[in-house]
Amino acid sequence: MRLLRWIFQRDNQTLTCQVDQQPGAGNYTLSLVPHSDAAAEIAETFNTAWSAFRRHATIATELRRSGWTLAAYTAD
């Protein structure tokens, strides 16, 4: 189940950073997916939602410092 999805943009590049809860497992996955190459997805797994959201916030901060802007977001 998707909990959070932010789409970042820099120049002509687009990147999704999202947090999903794994059904039945109680784990949370944070994924970074470049839209130009979905096969280059990076995923990290966390035991708590708090840890996944904290990591998402850290990545979002670093992306903004690197010139990325938030283009869209959803909280499903």
Residue ranges and their predicted role:
Residues 1-25:
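N-terminal segment of the canonical double-stranded RNA-binding domain
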Residues 1-5, 34, 69-76:
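Intrinsically disordered, low-complexity regulatory segments
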Residues 14-15, 62-76:
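Short, mixed-charge low-complexity intrinsically disordered segments
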Residues 16-42:
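Short aromatic-glycine-(Arg/Gly/Cys) micro-motifs in beta-strand/loop hairpins
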Residues 33-35, 46, 59-61, 71-73:
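Short, charged/polar low-complexity linear motifs in solvent-exposed/disordered segments
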Residues 47-65:
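A short, charged, amphipathic alpha-helix used as a generic interaction element across diverse proteins
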